[in-house]
Amino acid sequence: MERKMEVHSLGYRTDLIFPKFDGEIIDRGVYLVILTPSNPTFYWGNFLLFPNPPGKDDFGNWKRVFAEEIGSRLNVEHMAFGWDSVEGQLGEVKPFLDEGFNLNQSVVLDTHQVKIPPKYNREVMIRPITEDWEWEQAIQNQIACRPPEFSLQGYQVFKRGQMERYRQMTRAGLGVWVGAFLEKQLVADLGVFVTDKIGRFQQVETHPEYRRRGICGTLVYRASCYALEHIGVNTLVMVADENYHAAKIYESIGFKPKEHQVSLDWWDKSKV
């Protein structure tokens, strides 16, 4: 019988919602190959997922496997590796860090019910987005929230491809994209997508000019209520940077830490 790799972590299990829609997942038994041919610039749409953290000989092995499995298929300029642990085990990451890889440490939070955040914004109108102009504003908001380590031109290409995937998924009934508006100006947005009654949040972003007003917490709360009531979920999942304040906002709404997720990625920063 052919060996299969079973993914145990809630974070990575829900990450696979997206390549299952329009990408490819190749199960090699001892690792998974995740591909998004429509968006090769999407680092975490084109990565390898291993069952365990890197061991002492895995630096060279993992790079070789990435080149064979992903680099040979797509025109990529990055490497990305995840491992299916739930307690944040690092393993032998030093050789990767010495070669310029980034270590990503995230907390996976979940909840079955939410509560009104302590800083609730009553000025914003929150609703699912459907119109072309709303989607374009969402794209522009996502680009405005670009991390500074990425070039604007490259990030625009990546983000437009990513948002087109999300739009197609909403059209297929697999989730919802929600915006927070002040009059007709979108100031924050996010997505929630469904698998097996689990709703996974994506790309929670508030425009830099509208932060610290309670908009993020209000948006997540209202989107959570919508997902629990209208799109058939009973569990909500959020993945956040362990060292970023957003996790505290989510906890104020009722999310609780469940797992710790670790990954590594690399790209040529001389091109930024």
Predicted segments with their positions:
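N-terminal charged segments
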Residues: 1-76, 87-89, 168
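Conserved active-site alpha-helix within GNAT-family acetyltransferase domains
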Residues: 87-103, 213, 217, 242-260
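A conserved beta-strand-loop-helix scaffold within acyl/acetyltransferase catalytic domains
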Residues: 150, 157-205
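Acyl-donor-binding surface of acyltransferase catalytic domains
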Residues: 58-136, 264-266
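Conserved beta-hairpin
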Residues: 24-29, 85, 91-102, 174-188
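Conserved acetyl-CoA-binding loop-helix of GNAT-fold acetyltransferases
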Residues: 59-67, 203-208, 212-229, 248-252
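Conserved GNAT acetyl-CoA-binding A-motif
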Residues: 73-85, 227-241
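Short amphipathic alpha-helix that is part of the acyltransferase structural core
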Residues: 1-13, 49, 53-54, 117-162
